[in-house]
From Swiss-Prot:
Keywords: Carbohydrate metabolism, Hydrolase, Magnesium, Metal-binding. It catalyses: 2-phosphoglycolate + H2O = glycolate + phosphate. Mg(2+) binds at residues 19, 21, 182. GO terms for molecular function: metal ion binding; phosphoglycolate phosphatase activity. This is Phosphoglycolate phosphatase. The keyword Magnesium applies. Pfam families: HAD_2. It comes from Pseudomonas savastanoi pv. phaseolicola (strain 1448A / Race 6). Coiled coil: none annotated. It comes from the Bacteria. The keyword Ligase does not apply. GO terms for biological process: carbohydrate metabolic process; DNA repair; glycolate biosynthetic process.
Amino acid sequence: MSGFEQLFAGKLPKLVMFDLDGTLVDSVPDLAVAVDTMLAELGRPIAGLESVRAWVGNGAPVLVRRALANHLDHSGVDDELAEQGLEIFMRAYAQKHEFTVVYPGVRETLKWLQKMGVEMALITNKPERFVAPLLDEMKLGRFFRWIIGGDTMPQKKPDPAALFFVMKMAGVPASQALFVGDSRSDVQAAKAAGVACVALSYGYNHGRPIAEENPAMVIDDLRKLIPGCLDMDAEILLPDINSPSSRESIVVVTRKLWMKVIKALARWRWRA
């Protein structure tokens, strides 16, 4: 039985919200290049791929602080140094994403959901300025009606504000929505919003098994959500959906727009 069939009693959710890094794309190689560039400019030893893989998931400022601390615990990092490091990192990461790849099964799953008329949103802690260019490079942007970056709203995951916002915009209750992610922040945000969460075992969770966070389901391939597609050896052929003739059908939520609706979301503000 597929993931959707198990979670929604044989039906499909009306809305699926996705994380980006570690869920749809493996961006660690490019993030590691930017982190090491930052560390080298500051005269510090480079971190390397595997260290960066353990540090990602909570946004660029936290990643930079962890790199400067060379540890998950970054409480001792000087704020001025962190700001300097963040500026260098952002400049380095903005240059290119040549090593980022889309995970197997992602495009097939997104195409299938689009074909079935399921609304989709992207909610990531990645800084807003990097999200749309990366989605364009990976040819994933056309699948999402709503796109929210880590600095789009005053709160980021694990705060559920972005999930509440998207559900309100879509007119979909939590019982008919799903969040798909790979980290503790994703699971916590989904639980706080009352939304079922499917977690990917291949993503970034600071080196800890994502099953420890008790999501509704853990899978190792997005195609396991699709009815009839549990055989990973079977090729999945889906007709391409024509790209929207106008970008007006895609809503990229920006900080300016968010400030107009923040009062409407205030009653949903999560209290930790």
